[in-house]
């Protein structure tokens, strides 16, 4: 499965099961205000693949820092599973924001979300769990999404359940033991 296929499948799971993802803040209104949770979960899914990818979670802020948005850069390409949330408010000023973004070279809102902060997928997961959500609930949501992805097309999913669960548990254990340093933002 390619990263683009995984992104599209993950978005489908989010659309179909957003009401079940209560461990992710704001997911009952998906895609509105769900960018951080969606980016963190998708970033961890990519990190759990058997192939190696450079995954960066990007937080962009407006110039006045009143609005922010999260997306991913994976191997130099942009993935934004919640970009379409801006169609109603920014669609008259920016093109290409009516659907999610899968593997673009540039983010269409790069000039709107001007100031950018970048973190690895694992650090972004740690920050999200420590500052915005409950670690166990986020892990449960991640495992739920993984199980739904496996049910979509089992032959294409490259997420070995035992190995991926072990890696996720190790990250959660590091968070609990305080070994996952979260910088002050």
Language-model features: locations:
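A structural boundary/capping signal
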Residues: 1-185
